[in-house]
């Protein structure tokens, strides 16, 4: 029972329990469903408890083992795709804390336990489009699965960010997407056939995971079976017929990088805006796929005892990406800002942002900017990043105002 004064949340809406009357009888609370108290997704009716397993008066949080938690809503600007994950936000916060405290602070990634064998992947995969459309395509096969409900910690982690748990495989891919920012997809091997093809679609219809029917065009990138049947709209949404279910015993787990413009056009034409397309449309770093793939595989192996990776890792990566090369002139930076920032601070800020100083020639610094920072490709972008971490509040305001005035009477 939610008593008077309790604040309940249903999706993005919240309401406070107040004293009221129902059919002339005073009400001092409300019986709740799972979704209303945040312990599940069932909203069909009130929760029925076993009277023999619980003592009246026990707090619901204690009975369900719900610990205190906080959900932070972060408003990410469109150019900061690197921050569209928990790790991305933590990495940026670490750079700020390094500058503020003077001690090196680093965002840490979990240890990976999955280790594919040396050799080839047992599932044939062919990439039939230019590297510009699909810069990288990786995947591995996992067999011996018993797909069921995810453990409580994983279900709660997804529910707290507004996602509905599906099954352990799908939940892991969604978890890693939000943890690391790299979309993943799992195909039921029994529905794939003799292999996978990354290709442009034919003029055909496809039933998607949300049960909607999309009309594909020859400009849409898809992952198809060996006979050409589309299984997934690349970077947007998987197909209903190839997804994992409780009957799935083996999967092909995919982590890929798709062209931002291609994904954007396809998603818009199909009227879809998914967590996957949201990230691909803004440009992802192909170097990030391996960690995400092995992280998801590690979790699946941990949560599905008896499962194992079969064979090696498939990796189509014909043109490996390089860091952005930027030359920073410190004198230019000081003129642009209107104040000198100590070189020691500049070096520390760049290091905290994982921007490598590859060479110094006096005031000219050669930089290697990580590919995941798609918004930092020019000297002015680097200056903006340095100033953002250094602190705008530390820049003194000039007492002078510079303006160009037109002569009297000029138009």
Where do the model's predicted regions map?
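RNA/tRNA-interacting regions in translation and RNA-turnover enzymes
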Residues: 1-411
């Amino acid at each position: 029972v939610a008593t008077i004064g309790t604040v309940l949340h249903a999706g993005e809406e919240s309401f406070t329990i107040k004293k009221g009357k129902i059919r002339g009888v005073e009400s001092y609370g409300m019986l709740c469903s799972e979704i209303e108290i945040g312990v599940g997704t069932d909203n069909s009716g009130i929760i029925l408890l076993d009277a023999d397993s619980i003592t009246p008066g026990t707090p619901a949080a204690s009975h369900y083992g719900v610990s205190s938690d906080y959900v932070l809503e972060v408003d990410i600007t469109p150019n900061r795709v690197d921050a569209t994950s928990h790790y991305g936000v933590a990495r940026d916060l670490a750079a700020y804390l390094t500058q503020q405290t003077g001690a090196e602070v680093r965002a840490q990634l979990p240890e990976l336990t999955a280790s594919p064998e040396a050799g080839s992947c047992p599932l044939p995969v062919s990439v039939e489009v230019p590297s510009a459309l699909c810069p990288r395509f990786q995947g591995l096969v996992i067999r011996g699965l018993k797909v069921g409900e995810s453990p409580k910690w994983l279900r709660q982690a997804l529910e707290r960010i507004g996602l509905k748990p599906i099954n352990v495989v799908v939940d892991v891919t969604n978890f890693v997407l939000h943890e690391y920012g790299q979309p993943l997809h799992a195909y039921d091997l029994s529905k794939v056939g003799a292999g996978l093809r990354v290709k442009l679609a034919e003029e055909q219809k496809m039933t998607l995971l949300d049960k909607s029917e999309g009309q594909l065009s020859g400009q849409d990138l898809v992952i198809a079976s060996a006979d050409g049947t589309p299984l997934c709209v690349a970077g947007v949404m998987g197909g209903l017929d190839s997804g994992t279910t409780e009957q799935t015993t083996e999967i092909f787990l995919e982590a890929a990088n798709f062209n931002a413009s291609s994904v954007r056009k396809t998603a818009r034409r199909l009227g879809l805006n998914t967590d996957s397309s949201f990230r691909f449309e803004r440009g992802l770093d192909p170097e990030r796929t391996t960690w995400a793939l092995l992280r998801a595989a590690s979790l699946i192996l941990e949560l599905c005892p008896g499962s194992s990776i079969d064979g090696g890792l498939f990796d189509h990566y014909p043109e490996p990406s390089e860091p952005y090369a930027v030359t920073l002139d410190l004198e230019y930076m000081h003129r642009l800002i209107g104040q000198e920032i100590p070189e020691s601070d500049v070096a520390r800020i760049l290091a905290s942002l994982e921007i490598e100083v590859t060479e110094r020639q006096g005031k000219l610094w050669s930089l290697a900017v990580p590919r995941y920072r798609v918004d930092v490709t020019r000297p002015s972008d680097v200056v903006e990043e340095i100033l953002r971490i250094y602190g705008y509040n530390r820049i003194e305001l000039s007492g002078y105002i510079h303006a160009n005035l037109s002569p009297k009477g000029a138009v």
